Amino acid sequence: MTAPKIEAVYTVGAYLLDRLAELGVTEIFGVPGDYTLEFLDHIVAHPTIRWVGNANELNAGYAADGYGRLRGISALVTTFGVGELSAANAIAGSYAEHVPVVHIVGAPPKDAQSTHRALHHSLGDGDFEHFIRISSEITCSQANLTTATACKEIDRVLSEVRKHKRPGYILLSTDVARFPTEPPAAPLPGHTDGTSPRALSLFIDAATKLIADKRMTVLADLLVHRLQVVKELETLLTADVVPYATLMWGKSLLDESSPNFLGIYAGAASTEAVRAAIEQAPVLVTAGVVFTDMVSGFFSQRIDPARTIDVGQYQSSVADKVFTPLEMGDALEALASILVRRGVSSPPVELPPGNPTADTPSPTQRLTQQILWDRLCAALTPGNVVLADQGTAFYGMVEHRLPRGVTFIGQPLWGSIGYTLPAALGAGLAHRNRRTVLLLGDGAAQLTIQELGSFYREGLSPVIVVVNNDGYTIERAIHGATAPYNNIARWRWTDIPGALGVANHSSFRAETYGELDEAFAVAAELKDQMVFVEVIVPKLDLPSLLTALTRPAQDSNRIFQLPNPGWDN
């Protein structure tokens, strides 16, 4: 590939790329458009950043999301109007799920905008700020760059994205992108601790009194990961014998192979043992917890505030008393120090068993959801990155314990089906040394399958499992089991990788345990190529956790008039 010729003068576009590289971005996703082409030349010529073109802008946004979850930041480039709006669903998902993505939008030159003429990719009314106003609802920071303040505004948006762990939006006109400027004079300012010493001191006093000599239990969620304070939480967990659980959103946040791991807490949909351990804990620490409908069993959690220490991003509470400003990492370190200072070791506790060991099915046994996820979990190895789409794949996997060193990615709040396929591309590029395992349903795959060829082009070798249950099974479980709107077109799935340009791959169609076992054995052996497995399961078969969750959803009143859990949080 011939690199484009770039003028020697340093530009605003180069400044933006150098700042992204400084934050750890080595790939930028997107789809080219005429308002971005010159900026793309700078990307191609950049010494450390590569361009990764996608099949469409929505997929580019999903890929950037998957990359950002593992790298801590990501970027995509789309063109004005038509391109950015195609990516808006993905950006909204990143906002909902606290993923830092920088969305760079190429726009017409400023002088053309000033004429207020009906330029292509606009609404034709001469107003070129419609879309930045839309973006303000789904990003934490926005900038319409001008030549006078471009570099300052770039730094502001990137700093806000890094601080809030949410997307940012940069509108980059073609003339501003090529405008001369100076390279960064210094690195972006790092994180400054926003904790008040007085708030921390009062928090320690209150927490010490509540904890006393009682056993502590921890319930953790995804904000611990997004705010990069996992080590601080692990220090707390090793300061004593501390049982812990996570919500579905925080799955794989902590070691699930530990004898202290309780399992997944999902309110009334939890196992009885996990529910009792969390809801009856003498002292419960909730770290980075956000109760959403689907991860809490439709808000059926029973958490008593009087026995709870809640640790949030910028504030913490002990019982009914709030302490702010107090950053999460500082609060977790303080709790660990309290356990160390008290010098009382809690006795071991009886915890629920891990994945139950069932009898190995016969090779001719027809596959079910339970057999599929049992066998898949047994095939995982440390280092795998598992992406489970928001369907039976997600709920089938979350109730299984993962090996240490496996990362799990799902999207239970935004829940945009098809998200995980392009996100797996981004995750694979974020950590090339870790093999991705992609799990999604047939209906979800039909939305984003165009990106499959990009895996081969980028030299990635994922294991892809498409669950063929002949349509939208979760919707069938909620309403309309035989309704035509829950049907989809039937595809020849094993032909698709080759049709989309994946030259080096192995495809399997598994209806029995023996066929599934063979496919996974080949996947374990062939680590340098894509292994694509179509798995046939009954149309109305559900994982047990999903069965528990869909009971309240079957009553439409429960969807919109959710029960009051009886506690404040």
UniProtKB/Swiss-Prot annotation:
Residues 392-474 are annotated as: Thiamine pyrophosphate binding. Its cofactor is a metal cation; thiamine diphosphate. GO terms for molecular function: magnesium ion binding; pyruvate decarboxylase activity; thiamine pyrophosphate binding. Thiamine diphosphate binds at residue 57. InterPro entries: DHS-like_NAD/FAD-binding_dom, PDC/IPDC-like, THDP-binding, Thiamin_PyroP_enz_cen_dom, Thiamin_PyroP_enz_TPP-bd_dom, TPP_enzyme_TPP-bd, TPP_PDC_IPDC, TPP_PYR_PDC_IPDC-like. Mg(2+) binds at residues 442, 469, 471. GO terms for biological process: aromatic amino acid family catabolic process to alcohol via Ehrlich pathway. One of its GO terms (cellular component) is cytosol. Binds 1 metal ion per subunit. Binds 1 thiamine pyrophosphate per subunit. Keywords: Decarboxylase, Lyase, Magnesium, Metal-binding, Thiamine pyrophosphate. Its EC number is 4.1.1.-. Decarboxylates branched-chain and aromatic alpha-keto acids to aldehydes. Belongs to the TPP enzyme family. This is Alpha-keto-acid decarboxylase. It comes from Mycobacterium leprae (strain TN).
